[in-house]
Amino acid sequence: MKSMPVAPIADLRVAQLIDANLDRAREGLRVVEDWCRFGLDREDLVVTLKDWRQRLGRHHHDSYKQARSTATDQGIGLSHPAQQERHEPWHVVAANCARVQEALRVLEEFARQPDPQLAASAAAIRYGLYDLEVTVLQANAGKKRRQQLQACHLCLITTSQSDLANNDLFRTVSAALVAGIDMVQYRNKEASDLQRLTQAKELASLCRKHGALFIVNDRIDLALAVDADGVHLGQDDLPTDVARGLIGSERLLGRSTQFLAQLQKAEAEGCDYLGVGPVNSTATKPERQPIGLAYVKEASKATQLPWFAIGGINISNLEAVRQAGAKRIAVIGAIMNSKDPAATSLQLLEALR
């Protein structure tokens, strides 16, 4: 829709103010738009941001531009120490979302009488940006998690043994995190929900402290309750589309697979990573027949998704698993039952890297 021409504003200061805030809003929208385009690959967000930017452009009449006087603008060249603290792209995006929202609010207030169409557009865009900012935040978190997942080598899955005291659990996981493991999957099928919640909260905190991913096994409700990075599901758990609808696109979704058809199905459904195994017999699931190295070799050729070989892997048989094509492994007993979990974690990491 075309913006109706407006008569020159009698108060030059208001015209200058409108001009400056139109510039500010359009520039800020472009910063966010370019991050959505190049950083997030989100065409849907780019289309919306471009539309808003062009709508404001149609309201940027010559009468506003002609009132511009950069030579006498006391705000030219001003900066703030916080600008030097924007180390991550998201910091830049968040700052520009706030910048646009503030500029739009100023336009609403000062354009209400001289240019009601501009005021209405500014209000509509401001409220839209509040929602879009949340979407960008979630997309950014999801992208960061997936980048971190790509760099993972070693995932520690916790034991379900009911006699493992909290302190022993936390001490073991903490030692492994200090050694440099990339990811922890919380698995405990024997504890009460309250015990699981207590343990998951502490483990999530430890993982955040050490910059590792934290995944909850099976329990989407628990993953959401502790703000985990994702959830890992077995073949008999919720379908992928249902699980994704619950955890959102910003969290990771993993799926265990035992043969190629399951792997291909999980990838097609949109899982972020896969478990491949059990490679060897394991005390965790003694009833499950090990699939050996043949499926590991198949998986290495069948998918570009990150995947973890799992099942009875330890330092003595790891090289054979690597030779079969595995770049990532998930272990339970090798670390959880180790007398020196930090040293064992280091050994495994060195062998993988």
From Swiss-Prot:
Residues 129-353 are annotated as: Thiamine-phosphate synthase. GO terms for molecular function: magnesium ion binding; thiamine-phosphate diphosphorylase activity. Its cofactor is Mg(2+). It comes from Prochlorococcus marinus (strain MIT 9303). 2-[(2R,5Z)-2-carboxy-4-methylthiazol-5(2H)-ylidene]ethyl phosphate binds at T282, A283, T284, G312. The keyword Magnesium applies. Binds 1 Mg(2+) ion per subunit. Pathway: Cofactor biosynthesis; thiamine diphosphate biosynthesis; thiamine phosphate from 4-amino-2-methyl-5-diphosphomethylpyrimidine and 4-methyl-5-(2-phosphoethyl)-thiazole: step 1/1. This is Thiamine-phosphate synthase. Residues 1-128 are annotated as: Unknown. HAMAP family: TMP_synthase, TMP_synthase_cyanobact. It holds the Pfam family ThiD2. 4-amino-2-methyl-5-(diphosphooxymethyl)pyrimidine binds at Q185, Y186, R187, N188, K189, N217, S256, K285. Condenses 4-methyl-5-(beta-hydroxyethyl)thiazole monophosphate (THZ-P) and 2-methyl-4-amino-5-hydroxymethyl pyrimidine pyrophosphate (HMP-PP) to form thiamine monophosphate (TMP). Its EC number is 2.5.1.3. It catalyses: 2-[(2R,5Z)-2-carboxy-4-methylthiazol-5(2H)-ylidene]ethyl phosphate + 4-amino-2-methyl-5-(diphosphooxymethyl)pyrimidine + 2 H(+) = thiamine phosphate + CO2 + diphosphate; 2-(2-carboxy-4-methylthiazol-5-yl)ethyl phosphate + 4-amino-2-methyl-5-(diphosphooxymethyl)pyrimidine + 2 H(+) = thiamine phosphate + CO2 + diphosphate; 4-methyl-5-(2-phosphooxyethyl)-thiazole + 4-amino-2-methyl-5-(diphosphooxymethyl)pyrimidine + H(+) = thiamine phosphate + diphosphate. InterPro entries: Aldolase_TIM, ThiamineP_synth_sf, ThiamineP_synth_TenI, ThiD2, TMP_synthase, TMP_synthase_cyanobac_bac. Keywords: Magnesium, Metal-binding, Thiamine biosynthesis, Transferase. CDD domains: TMP_TenI. GO terms for biological process: thiamine biosynthetic process; thiamine diphosphate biosynthetic process. Mg(2+) binds at D218, D237. The keyword Transferase applies. GO terms for cellular component: cytoplasm.
